[in-house]
Amino acid sequence: MEQTQTAEGTDLLIGDEKTNDLPFVQLFLEEIGCTQYLDSFIQCNLVTEEEIKYLDKDILIALGVNKIGDRLKILRKSKSFQRDKRIEQVNRLKNLMEKVSSLSTATLSMNSELIPEKHCVIFILNDGSAKKVNVNGCFNADSIKKRLIRRLPHELLATNSNGEVTKMVQDYDVFVLDYTKNVLHLLYDVELVTICHANDRVEKNRLIFVSKDQTPSDKAISTSKKLYLRTLSALSQVGPSSSNLLAQNKGISHNNAEGKLRIDNTEKDRIRQIFNQRPPSEFISTNLAGYFPHTDMKRLQKTMRESFRHSARLSIAQRRPLSAESNNIGDILLKHSNAVDMALLQGLDQTRLSSKLDTTKIPKLAHKRPEDNDAISNQLELLSVESGEEEDHDFFGEDSDIVSLPTKIATPKNWLKGACIGSGSFGSVYLGMNAHTGELMAVKQVEIKNNNIGVSTDNNKQANSDENNEQEEQQEKIEDVGAVSHPKTNQNIHRKMVDALQHEMNLLKELHHENIVTYYGASQEGGNLNIFLEYVPGGSVSSMLNNYGPFEESLITNFTRQILIGVAYLHKKKIIHRDIKGANILIDIKGCVKITDFGISKKLSPLNKKQNKRASLQGSVFWMSPEVVKQSATTAKADIWSTGCVVIEMFTGKHPFPDFSQMQAIFKIGTNTTPEIPSWATSEGKNFLRKAFELDYQYRPGALELLQHPWLDAHII
């Protein structure tokens, strides 16, 4: 009774609010049999659930709860309030999701039909409305856009510079909202086609379609969000069959709630999967229109036809089997044709075959004359080129035995430009195809302004190119966030981009190695400077890590061995790459490593060693060696350090010093801090990395020495 009176007296002192709260603390302590501590709780003003749920051992001791048993009972009960609170928050979130899901746009009924359909895509217009389009039969971005443009209301059509309404596909863009970073992503043509024809891409239900002179409006973005949430809600109700889709599109993460939808933070990478990975040549050959969306169809068809005939001619003249690794469109089509022919021949009755055919000629039957190839061309839909425009040539006439075969791929005089597949140190990289031979290429391209120099192919200009450029070289890879854009600065940067591309061209001329991208030539046309390089289907180490996560150690040793072989070749040629990193290491679909991007590479000469001038700061920060950061020396050993950083990338899926900014990383490296070596690496792997990260470059082993390290032999068997 005394306690009650005391409590009531205190209750009157602290006011009506506390009067209402007292029953809670009383019930709390009575439930666990600890009412003897009620006065202490009231005196310390610990009377509400919000205050009690944060109790800990020290607070209870201060309150005079000295018995361990009582402390345990109070703590267990208080922690249960936190769990109840989390459950309540989860329920609130679910209710909120249901309310949002119940929203609908004015022109679209959002129901279970939002589960991705094979041939249907939903485009959101800038007025917030949405249209469902059947894209069946549309195998390039232009045809998809045309099908939608025909259905656009007049007020949403684009206008040209003269203010006239236009229905040209190049006047429209397609965006998709990336919910991981709250940014709008402009789709490449290849990405648009890939998304539209994929069964497991829920982005196809919320593509935003606008004219080039506009950006997605708030109404369009709002509709996109509603469609996105409704799609996830519909997927969750479908059951196990949609589990993969949900796993790929989980959403909006909240640390204090469990068991709810999240947006996968790799969604943007998934959208750009084709962009990053460089699709295989055979995949491109089945959808050339999609990968060369801006190329005239007749010209593309003519190129395919000529490439097919050229491959047939060389195959018979050389008596050579077709290479499975060829990037030539004609070789791929001919290989498919031959495979069908051989299957048909093997299926013939052996008695009929022996009586009607000379078996010694069977292998040659796979190589058809161009006249016979017309039937195959019909299947490939190549015959839209009128027969009067191009007559069948007799490739196998009297002179067929004295055909002059090229020993290497010549610089293409005429080529077709395809989709953008990446970017290098300077400029963008496009998919290209030799218009005469059908050979696929990677074309590195930089726009040349009026006051820039043209392409120089004279070898004698290379000798002084490094010295002339050294004083002007920019620190291009280090992002200066505080830099102010200036017209003259931009002009100088653009000039250096062109110089770097010419410099890369001059270096690549000298390089012929399995682990270095092959140089096909260069040209200057249409205000652009082009370098034609070997097309490497597959992707970079960086893109593979983004898509698949860290590698197994056996795979790391395989790739590292090939990287070092390529680096050793470069160093033998007195060339320092200076930008070895995961993004510049390409892996083809056969697992062969190709080192690329020589935009800031340097060729050493005796003059380099005599000069006392300070070394320039070149490269990508997180892969830089201490001597590069300190600008104390220009040496091939910098590539060894960078190779070690690539090994770290492959082990962890992240670059070295992942928790630091670029300036912080520069400070760390400059103060002789080495990258952290993965604890799960084998002892040989750790030893390899310690050698690669030797701080003194004079004691750091070279590529040939590291190639003999036991770690690189440990996983060969």
Swiss-Prot record:
Modified residues (Phosphoserine): S323, S465
CDD domains: SAM_Ste11_fungal
Sequence segments annotated as region (Disordered): 453-479
Catalytic activity of the protein: L-seryl-[protein] + ATP = O-phospho-L-seryl-[protein] + ADP + H(+); L-threonyl-[protein] + ATP = O-phospho-L-threonyl-[protein] + ADP + H(+)
Sequence positions that bind ATP: I421, G422, S423, G424, S425, F426, G427, S428, V429, K444
Active site: D579 (proton acceptor)
Biased composition, class Polar residues, residue ranges: 453-466
Gene3D superfamilies the record matches: Phosphatidylinositol 3-kinase Catalytic Subunit, Chain A, domain 1, Transcription Factor, Ets-1, Transferase(Phosphotransferase) domain 1
Keyword Transport: no
Protein name, as recorded: Serine/threonine-protein kinase STE11
Gene: STE11
